[in-house]
Amino acid sequence: MTHPPTFPLRQDLRRIADLVTAGSRVLDIGCGDGALLAYLVAEKQVIGRGLELSPAGVHDSVSRGLSVIQGDADQDLADYPDLAFDFVILSRTLQAMRQPLDVLRHLVRIGQRAIVSIPNFGL
């Protein structure tokens, strides 16, 4: 059952959130300001972690009380152990990767399930 968010969340992020099981371990790669991760922690009680390239995004995420580190998905995903997370999310980030196939390989290695979304520039 889907509940309305307690704070604003983009429509595409709500759709991703609906795919995540309550109480699961989640890694949000390219988490930006942490909006999705904050929602998942608050509404689905996930154990959430984030990886974000932008110092401003890390600051915003940490300010929300989230466990987010600064890192580059093209380089830093190799450091994560196999099956460390139930869900690995890569939202609106794949198109910015220098090595997208390597990043996707790490996603399916790190998580039991991977959720990948890309922006629709036509909208």
List where the protein language model places each region:
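A short glycine-rich, Lys/Arg-flanked "PGG" loop and its adjoining helix->strand segment in the class I
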Residues: 101-115
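Class I SAM-dependent methyltransferase SAM/SAH-binding core
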Residues: 39-76
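A short SAM/SAH-binding and catalytic strip from SAM-dependent methyltransferases
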Residues: 87-98
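Conserved alpha-helix/loop element of class I SAM-dependent methyltransferases that forms part
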Residues: 7-23
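Conserved class I S-adenosyl-L-methionine
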Residues: 24-32, 116-123
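Glycine-rich SAM-binding Motif I of class I
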Residues: 34-38
